[in-house]
């Protein structure tokens, strides 16, 4: 009589990431068609939306839904790191229960920046153990980073994204038109994540950012001029494509050496300690500046390349230094990162511009020395 069994299963994950203009234009059905397994004349949708986005686009969204005879419920969430909690997830779940969506053919729609996408994604992954959802990022950081992957999460205690899941959306709709109403600081915030990809993976993307930094800021990557449109489309294509190239073979992070973790070794601790002073991309930039100095000290990045990198950071209106970057924080962050990466540092660090390697032997003394050098280079900011 058998007393031991083994079950084995595989699941194929496919999701579409699509650039689309005018996602709230009633003539564009992409929002309702995304993730829908059944097309009906009377669709129903539960929509989680960022409070700031709702204030600007709420009327347009309602007109869109009315045009398509869609029954809907809006769940409006605050978009702040302080609100990125399980309480917000439960707010979404309460709304889902009240609205009573069909489990498979009425996908949840999440509209907002990375925070709201993470909250809604976590709720979708948990509700009835999995409910399809569609991501519609409205911030630049959402368009090139949070909106195109499969991670969900909320903060817990003093830890960023300590609770979360891997749960792919059925689709992500990228409409850069939303960037017209994003403030300047949040445009810079998103450009930090694009710069991340450039520094460790794509020298041509760095060249584009170096050549057109002011144009990218002035036109908000929305293509207001013919030249700006060409540049913005190429930047988006390289940033999103580069991100997906890294994510696709390792969606569940079975391999913990990840290029896309560049800038995310010390920044989670720095960002949470500095709340609300630093945005995510700003903390990532300080992290990248620190590791660029480390790379220079190890002979992996030339002084001239380090100067070019810092110049682009500053031209994108991003900080290269923060006064909280001291020995105690660095030691804590290194310990947390090593634990998160299963006992090895697996620290992505630039090699020149557009290349990278992983380090496992950083010491606190080396880090604090690099931080002191960074303070001297950027401490006036």
Curated annotation (Swiss-Prot):
| Catalytic site positions | 151
Q: Which cofactor does it need?
A: NAD(+); Co(2+)
Q: Name one GO biological process term.
A: antibiotic biosynthetic process
EC no. given is: 4.2.3.152
UniProt KW Transferase keyword? no
Give the reaction(s) catalysed.
D-sedoheptulose 7-phosphate = 2-epi-5-epi-valiolone + phosphate
Q: Name one GO molecular function term.
A: metal ion binding
Pfam short name (any one):
DHQ_synthase
Q: Which domain of life is it from?
A: Bacteria
Cite the binding residues for a divalent metal cation: 193, 264, 280
The protein's matches in Gene3D superfamilies, at most eight in alphabetical order, are given as:
3.40.50.1970, Dehydroquinate synthase-like - alpha domain (1.20.1090.10)
Q: What residues bind NAD(+), as annotated?
A: 50, 81-84, 114-118, 138-139, 151, 160, 178-181
- Identify the keywords attached in UniProt to this record, alphabetized: Antibiotic biosynthesis, Cobalt, Lyase, Metal-binding, NAD, Nucleotide-binding
UniProt entry tagged with the keyword Metal-binding:
yes
Which pathway?
Answer: Antibiotic biosynthesis
Q: Which family does it belong to?
A: Belongs to the sugar phosphate cyclases superfamily. EEVS family.
What does the protein in this record do? Catalyzes the cyclization of D-sedoheptulose 7-phosphate to 2-epi-5-epi-valiolone. Involved in cetoniacytone A biosynthesis.
Report what the protein is called.
2-epi-5-epi-valiolone synthase
Q: Which organism is it from?
A: Actinomyces sp
Gene, per the UniProt record: cetA
